[in-house]
């Protein structure tokens, strides 16, 4: 069995795996032990009391993190004519139509978020098997199939993140960087939790929020006391 490094031992001693921390305590611990040479992402994991195999228990949506994500989000847009120019002016890195489809089919996906005008969905639909598994397929319910491409591009770059429960009932989402202040991480934490509470499906039974944990990319997971969340949780 590999020996623990001094850093790992210090972290193990500082974070009690059997303890539930307040949100403020958890954020402080995660920031303190995010000591890698790169700016680690602060990640939130929320275990929900839903069974996503049932359509009436799916939890999915978008939320704008008020303090941003700390990431440079590259945006790809399927559009033609004036809408293509609008997307470029708004800051989209990749804009195209059939040419963009062919590039993606060839293995080139040079963006993090994908937006399309409604008239382009016939083209985008051919990419379902490629974009779908990556969570990049444009969706009108998420505001990524729209004629308001400028607003959609700006939202994607301005801190908007998509969330979707996985097959085990857990939502995973980045809520900032270790370089963020504790206050900024808390603001983003609150925004995402609020969005998840509002997205509670009618089919959910029993306790909705079962477990919450926060961590950094290379750091330990810190469990949060659900009693420290809004009453609706």
Swiss-Prot record:
Assigned keywords, A-Z? Repressor, Ribonucleoprotein, Ribosomal protein, RNA-binding, rRNA-binding, Translation regulation, tRNA-binding
- Tell me where on the tree of life, at the top rank, the source sits: Bacteria
Which Gene3D superfamilies would you find in this protein's record? 3.30.190.20, 3.40.50.790
User: Where are the annotated coiled coils located?
Assistant: none
Protein family: Belongs to the universal ribosomal protein uL1 family.
What does it do?
Binds directly to 23S rRNA. The L1 stalk is quite mobile in the ribosome, and is involved in E site tRNA release. Protein L1 is also a translational repressor protein, it controls the translation of the L11 operon by binding to its mRNA.
- Cited HAMAP family: Ribosomal_uL1_B
- What is the protein name stated in its UniProt record? Large ribosomal subunit protein uL1
**Species annotation:** Zymomonas mobilis subsp. mobilis (strain ATCC 31821 / ZM4 / CP4)
